[in-house]
Design a protein with these regions (language model features):
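Acidic anion/phosphate-binding donor-loop and adjacent secondary structure
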Residues: 35-36, 74-90
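Aromatic "clamp/platform" in nucleotide-sugar-dependent glycosyltransferases that forms part
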Residues: 191
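Donor nucleotide-sugar binding/catalytic pocket of nucleotide-sugar-dependent glycosyltransferases
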Residues: 45-56, 64-82
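Short alpha-helical donor nucleotide-sugar binding micro-motif in glycosyltransferases
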Residues: 177-183
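Extended catalytic core of nucleotide-activated donor transferases of GT-like folds
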Residues: 1-62, 175
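Short hydrophobic beta-strand element within catalytic cores of glycosyltransferases
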Residues: 208-211, 221, 227-229
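Conserved donor-binding/catalytic core segment of Leloir-type glycosyltransferases
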Residues: 90-107, 113-116, 128-130
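Nucleotide-activated donor-binding/catalytic signature segment of Leloir-type glycosyltransferases, i.e.
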Residues: 139-174
Length: 251
């Protein structure tokens, strides 16, 4: 028999290997499968997702549960480990919080910045490192990301904000592993994850993890091994928010 054909992105038609079993390995960060995806997914012989969260997301959209399997992602536990080299973080002080990801509405950095700068001030011995990018890693995108971060800090604590450091460079996996080991806690107030790779890497590196208690990271982060934050689900029907976050639309 022909070997399965595993798809990581939607092909144009079924002409590549028309007789081979077709498996789609996919994810999404909301509680519904996007409607434009449904017909393509239904045409697959098998659908694999990273998390129970997406198993439920796909099922409630009408895809038969027996068509959906779960194949969690693996990480290099030798690289992402408490043991290994650290890095010197210039201008950091005291207890170091680390957050990372693309600076989008879904990652919800604004809520994290608000909580941090309202809880602490420049008198506290703490640092928040924001390892983020916004659209890319060029100088232009780094400037845009840094400006968004500065604006958020200024809005929520214009007088005496605690220390916030921004790192917008693209780095190697080894440098990222060293950054985890050089921090004291990983925190991200995400609105939704289909995978939650940063959480997995941080936890494997031995960091306490503060996270939203919903979506894919709930597969491996529990109240027993992390610090889940309470959340509230809302319908995304505000036009102004839809304009800011089009990638979250399901139709």
């Amino acid at each position: 028999p022909l070997a399965p054909h595993v798809l990581y992105q939607l092909p144009k038609g079924q002409a590549i290997y028309p007789k081979a079993p077709t498996i789609c390995y996919t994810l999404f960060e909301s509680d519904r499968c996007p409607r434009p995806w449904i017909d393509a997914l239904m045409a697959m012989d098998r659908i694999l997702v990273f998390s129970r969260f997406n198993q439920e997301s796909w099922s409630v959209t009408g895809i038969p549960p027996n068509k959906i399997g779960r194949l969690p992602v693996a990480i290099d536990s030798f690289l992402y480990s408490p043991e290994g080299p650290k890095m010197g973080i210039e201008n950091s002080k005291g207890y170091v919080f680390l957050t990372s990801g693309d600076y989008t509405e879904r990652k919800n950095f604004e809520a994290l910045i608000e909580a941090y700068v309202k809880e602490f001030s420049d008198r506290d011995d703490v640092t928040l490192i924001v390892k983020a990018h916004y659209g890319g890693f060029t100088k232009r995108y780094r400037r845009e990301c840094a400006k968004r971060l500065e604006d958020s800090v200024r809005i929520f604590n214009p007088k005496n904000p605690p220390r916030v450091l921004f790192w917008g460079d693209k780095v190697s996996d080894h440098a990222m592993a060293a950054l985890y080991r050089s921090s004291d806690c990983f925190v991200l107030a995400t609105r939704g994850e289909g995978l939650g790779m940063q959480f997995l890497e941080a936890a494997a590196s031995g960091l306490p993890v503060i996270h939203t208690g919903w979506s894919a990271q709930a597969d491996f982060l529990t109240p027993q091994n992390s610090f889940p934050v309470e959340y509230r689900l809302e319908w995304m029907d505000d036009p102004s928010y839809i304009v800011k976050c089009p990638q979250s639309l399901n139709s």
